């Protein structure tokens, strides 16, 4: 017959001394449980229960540690979970381990630390309870990751077999980063508002880049074969230098004036070229020749020589001057002849190409309009069925058709302006503009807008650079909306803007954007499909206590559904497991929503 392993103590066996109840008993190896019987109706609360190995009571008994060979059921233990607490302090410790992993935690009032270890991973962490400071070390077979965070700065270091990455970042958006692989080394410094510098190094060369928030960029690339540098601003104006062992090339470009200058230097040739619009000038110098030229800019495949406006060529054979008009100042020597005086006593009128003719010597109607060709002329009155003028200045002109390369619009007060190929049409009197091709309106400066005003209210489409909500720094954006109170096109006008703003910013040709955000502003936001039917969605952001993440709200709705399933799975008994599952869903998805 087996013996009951429970040792029973009745309430009347207790003695009282020094403000405490006590009882003395002797336990043996078969005693597994001590039971206290009470005749009290209701709840009995026992505080500071203490077992001592003699008849003397003490305030604190140091626990004894006993080591014993596992036997019986203890040999089947698969997991241990220990908690260590000091009732006189805030110190506590937890030890939990099984055949898969081990977790050790210690904490006091201010700090806590944890060590987790498994066959695949080792994790160490020390953190502050009062704030977000911590340090963490994580090691796996693939590599090591270490993170240290203070109140304002965080550093992270990742080490794999094939790469090393180190990063330091601050709450103000500033950060620095260093990345290293077996064949490359790169670094980046960023102040969080759009100013940054990068350095990339490989065996093949070095690339250095510096940029600011205004999109001004300077870049230097160096290889064993050459060196290239370029400075660019937000309007894509740039200057560049390219150097190889064969020679040098420098270029300066202004997109607003459409002007470009370039210098090329080889061992046996130096050439310069300045281009603006459809005209370019060139200077070429070699060891035995110097050439100057002004010509119309055409592709090399279409050049015939007739596009040269004027040119000077100097070589061993002599000097050749080409031009429509050539003016020589001072004495001119032509084929060994010297003309000391420009006055000629007699000349056949058929040979006169220029000079002064006295009107009293010209017979009436001797010169007709179809024979008149001149560079500049002043007429008090001119009537012609057809006239061809390179430059025409007139106080008043009446004409039925004008074809001109360049026309000043300061005196055009009405009518229709049409493209010769039908691509566009502008009716000045009716204020209509038609675009009959794939039209584009280009704004080449930073701040541009299309505006309609009514009193102090302004409706607009705005293109500029601004700061997205929740970000630091400036990014290109487009905005459409309305402001009031005379705020104009300022979409960030302290709540007096209703509309949308769109932002996207990426470096160079990268597909991953640093900013990709659409913003909707308004006291009332309505989503509907019809102006006359009252249906759809309406929201008032001003009634929200804070910014709500709709993704988190979606997860909260799913969590609410899971709460119903937890209750349904336990027949709506609201037992401990059900309550714990529901509280866990609340803490994970709803508490901080």
Swiss-Prot record:
What Pfam families does this protein map onto? Answer: Gp58
Q: What is this protein called?
A: Uncharacterized 65 kDa protein in hyaluronidase region
Q: Which Gene3D superfamilies match?
A: 1.10.287.1490
Report the domain of life of the source organism: Viruses
